[in-house]
């Protein structure tokens, strides 16, 4: 029964997880939170991760009831993500693997989300909507690859929401997306915003530029409230995501949809996806914030699958890749 330790730190979340044969034994996590109206810089984020990662490692082992001798493999996020945070975590993973004399595995962050979603929900072969601060992709499995059927052609949906939160000076604690979601529940007026879908691809830079341009004027003149803008932005960008997911499901003949990534925690997105799936006679699968937000257990789970399939990452190849495509990885652990 192999036990895999996973390190995740591709953005402002740092997590260490332990997975053994499909069971999550530990999954502690910390978040680097910045003041309202600001984002997080790579260097500052990396310094935060370095300051807490060893405490998280000890916390994970204690929670799992394991020692270093019980761990069979060390997995870490190879990419995609922000360079400095990725490097800070990869250095610790390499060091731990050498100190404990354990094999090392570099894991694709996106595949970590997918494998954790499959594990937690029991979805067998879903069309995946992967939505986060750094990625927006519609994915389906075929011939040992997670194939990207559609994606953003500019910025990720989570990045769009985060940057809008800065315009309104919305708090980053616990996350700007969560706070937008709560404000949107009180919105009553739908403001017409640009809607850009091109086949199975989407674009969010136009809607962000538009709402950045008009937000302060509309608020100053009383045309709408901040809550109305949050509501309108959510409804518009989520409708775009539902459309391209449904198109991919129709193309693949899929009867399952799985939402993964930090934006996947949004209840309104889940409701809209559920409506679409019901109309197609399909099933929707989603996880809660423990597993849809970046976490160490998802890297451990993907690492576990790779470890069982015989994958290993030599030290000479254990760097990071900021632009690590989902479809670059050969998925040898699935039929």
From Swiss-Prot:
<feature type="binding site">
    <location>
        <position position="294"/>
    </location>
    <ligand>
        <name>a divalent metal cation</name>
    </ligand>
</feature>
<comment type="function">
    <text>Component of the EKC/KEOPS complex that is required for the formation of a threonylcarbamoyl group on adenosine at position 37 (t(6)A37) in tRNAs that read codons beginning with adenine. The complex is probably involved in the transfer of the threonylcarbamoyl moiety of threonylcarbamoyl-AMP (TC-AMP) to the N6 group of A37. OSGEP likely plays a direct catalytic role in this reaction, but requires other protein(s) of the complex to fulfill this activity.</text>
</comment>
<dbReference type="InterPro" id="IPR000905">
    <property type="entry name" value="Gcp-like_dom"/>
</dbReference>
<dbReference type="Pfam" id="PF00814">
    <property type="entry name" value="TsaD"/>
</dbReference>
<dbReference type="GO" id="GO:0046872">
    <property type="term" value="F:metal ion binding"/>
</dbReference>
<dbReference type="InterPro" id="IPR017860">
    <property type="entry name" value="Peptidase_M22_CS"/>
</dbReference>
<feature type="binding site">
    <location>
        <position position="181"/>
    </location>
    <ligand>
        <name>substrate</name>
    </ligand>
</feature>
<dbReference type="GO" id="GO:0005829">
    <property type="term" value="C:cytosol"/>
</dbReference>
<feature type="binding site">
    <location>
        <position position="162"/>
    </location>
    <ligand>
        <name>substrate</name>
    </ligand>
</feature>
<keyword id="KW-0808">Transferase</keyword>
<keyword id="KW-0819">tRNA processing</keyword>
<keyword id="KW-0963">Cytoplasm</keyword>
<keyword id="KW-0012">Acyltransferase</keyword>
<comment type="subunit">
    <text>Component of the EKC/KEOPS complex composed of at least GON7, TP53RK, TPRKB, OSGEP and LAGE3; the whole complex dimerizes.</text>
</comment>
<dbReference type="GO" id="GO:0005654">
    <property type="term" value="C:nucleoplasm"/>
</dbReference>
<feature type="binding site">
    <location>
        <position position="177"/>
    </location>
    <ligand>
        <name>substrate</name>
    </ligand>
</feature>
<dbReference type="GO" id="GO:0002949">
    <property type="term" value="P:tRNA threonylcarbamoyladenosine modification"/>
</dbReference>
<feature type="binding site">
    <location>
        <begin position="130"/>
        <end position="134"/>
    </location>
    <ligand>
        <name>substrate</name>
    </ligand>
</feature>
<dbReference type="InterPro" id="IPR017861">
    <property type="entry name" value="KAE1/TsaD"/>
</dbReference>
<comment type="similarity">
    <text>Belongs to the KAE1 / TsaD family.</text>
</comment>
<dbReference type="InterPro" id="IPR034680">
    <property type="entry name" value="Kae1_archaea_euk"/>
</dbReference>
<protein>
    <recommendedName>
        <fullName>tRNA N6-adenosine threonylcarbamoyltransferase</fullName>
        <ecNumber>2.3.1.234</ecNumber>
    </recommendedName>
</protein>
<keyword id="KW-0479">Metal-binding</keyword>
<dbReference type="GO" id="GO:0005634">
    <property type="term" value="C:nucleus"/>
</dbReference>
<dbReference type="GO" id="GO:0061711">
    <property type="term" value="F:N(6)-L-threonylcarbamoyladenine synthase activity"/>
</dbReference>
<keyword id="KW-0539">Nucleus</keyword>
<feature type="binding site">
    <location>
        <position position="130"/>
    </location>
    <ligand>
        <name>a divalent metal cation</name>
    </ligand>
</feature>
<dbReference type="GO" id="GO:0000408">
    <property type="term" value="C:EKC/KEOPS complex"/>
</dbReference>
<dbReference type="GO" id="GO:0005737">
    <property type="term" value="C:cytoplasm"/>
</dbReference>
<feature type="binding site">
    <location>
        <position position="109"/>
    </location>
    <ligand>
        <name>a divalent metal cation</name>
    </ligand>
</feature>
<feature type="binding site">
    <location>
        <position position="266"/>
    </location>
    <ligand>
        <name>substrate</name>
    </ligand>
</feature>
<feature type="binding site">
    <location>
        <position position="113"/>
    </location>
    <ligand>
        <name>a divalent metal cation</name>
    </ligand>
</feature>
<dbReference type="InterPro" id="IPR043129">
    <property type="entry name" value="ATPase_NBD"/>
</dbReference>
